[in-house]
Amino acid sequence: AHIDCDKECNRRCSKASAHDRCLKYCGICCEKCNCVPPGTYGNEDSCPCYANLKNSKGGHKCP
């Protein structure tokens, strides 16, 4: 079953300073992984796919 990425990413990004950017990247990662870690930051252990996606510079892609 697919999770509600909009809802999960709104929660994940609720405290982000770059809110629109956070939502964009969270959305991409959620679509790929069907998972968003709990809380607004960290907790990536529960979502290894999300934690391991990298951007073109080799940094973390997912907020």
From Swiss-Prot:
It comes from the Eukaryota. Pfam families: GASA. This is Cypmaclein. Expressed in pollen (at protein level). It comes from Cryptomeria japonica (Japanese cedar). PANTHER family: EXTENSIN, PROLINE-RICH PROTEIN. Belongs to the GASA family. Keywords: Allergen. InterPro entries: GASA.
